Amino acid sequence: MAEESSGLRVRREYGERMRKALVEKGLLDRSRKIRADESHVYLPVLDMDSASRIELEQIAPFEPVQKDFPPEERPATPEDILGYRPSFEVVGDIALVEEGDAEAVAAALIATSKGIKVVISPISEVEGEFRTRRFRHIAGEARTSTIHKEHGLRYRVDLEGAYFTERLGTERLRIAKLVKPGDFVLDMFAGVGPFSLLLAKKGAQVVAMDKNPLAIRCLQENAVLNKIRNIEILEGDAAELALRYVGRADHVIMNLPHSASSFLVPAMRAAKSGGVVHYYCIAPEDDLYRDEALIRKAADSLGAGVDVLYRGIVRSYAPRRHNVVIDFRVTKK
């Protein structure tokens, strides 16, 4: 005989209203399936006190019942298999997992996530002139390239050939909300274009540059893939290329966290008076915004003023180290 549990019998026209009320009050038993017949909906509920019953009576008429509510079937998760929640990042159909129990995590991800076709693990920090990482193949198809979707755009990415992380997605959207149609934007370290193309889509006139030839090829492909034409793409040293645009930029993006400080002077020269620079760096937890001193020193060398508009932690980078952003306005005399 099937085991019966507590529920509420509600006329169909009130079913959705009551379901939402139960969810809001934390009283819907999500481990069991909702039942229905031609005239009524049967909602599985958790134990409730008399005060909750009185509140629900104000939502819609109901009748308490004991009924067979079958268990709610849900897909298995990596946590179900492993016994803990693993840490991983997903770019397109590629999952990036940490070394250690990488094989076990990879097997759990492949088994439970239809969208994941590749599992790799980084075996180096961001390194070299083109700020790339090396990876070890763990499971699935043997590749590091994929198509990643973010904020309505598609990006062709080769994780071993050009740096990309989906963990900056929220930050990219924050910047997009600050940029107005018609603004002139200089993206000094554009990579495959996640800042540049999002801002161009919003109507900004974008100049995107990078020294990495593979990143530039991906960026060019991504501009075509997303049918974006209001962008100029340049391959070369940002310190030199930025000087083509002295005094023109409404916004300058400096997403090169490990060495952006070396490019502060050309970035400020490219900004117009009143323009805003979005500066990213890696900093220790006990001195998150220490690079403000470097920003002011660079401004002093140009006889310019700076006004810090925003400081924030973008993401945790390593134990007691964070990727931070400092937005500042440049004022030229």
Range-by-range predicted roles:
Residues 1-333:
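SAM-dependent transferase fold signal centered on methyltransferase-like domains
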